[in-house]
Amino acid sequence: AVAYPETTEEVSQILKICHAQECPVVAYGAASSLEGQHLAVAGGISLDMSRMARVLSLDAEDLKVTVQPGITRKSLNEELRATGLFFSVDPGADASVGGMAATRASGTTAVRYGTMRENVLALEAVMADGTIIRAGSDARKSSTGYDLAHLLIGSEGTLGIITELTLKLHGVPETIAAATCRFPSVEDAVNCVILTIQSGIPMARIELV
């Protein structure tokens, strides 16, 4: 069966019922996974998060945005276009941000902006028994309490279903230039990348083709 929740409370109610009936639940985002994490191989309930795809709040001055998990990376950046800000993690596919957090997505921009782990400030999640928790902090500088947010990031739905995320934003660069370089060996290419990063040049992406 497929369930289409629209709020955190609905996710909580679904998980409470499934927990009581010992029914498996698999979260379903944008189905962009190449590894099949969204497949309900043991049956049960497929929890389709596509109807939870809203931007809940935007704080451009503090460079952060709070969203529901079903919004995709491209849709989020379209919403942010007028602000001059963007969400930096780019795994290639147009994944949902909830799925990106659940799988600790990375991508070609990680060399400059980091992975999903570094770009989630706080989150809300529903545990298997329906309990709703909040983890992390909206503040950039915080050392209070257990770091449960980073425990949930990359847990692939095994610890809970992410229902809300507060994400870091970055300014869109004024200019972007791309170049292709040839090297006599892979070792030479790697050494060039190391020296480039050590020199402090703000590289957004570095790929080996």
Predicted feature residues:
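Glycine-rich N-terminal segment of FAD-binding domains in flavoprotein oxidoreductases
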Residues: 1-52, 69, 87
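FAD-binding subdomain of flavoenzyme oxidoreductases
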Residues: 54-61, 65-207
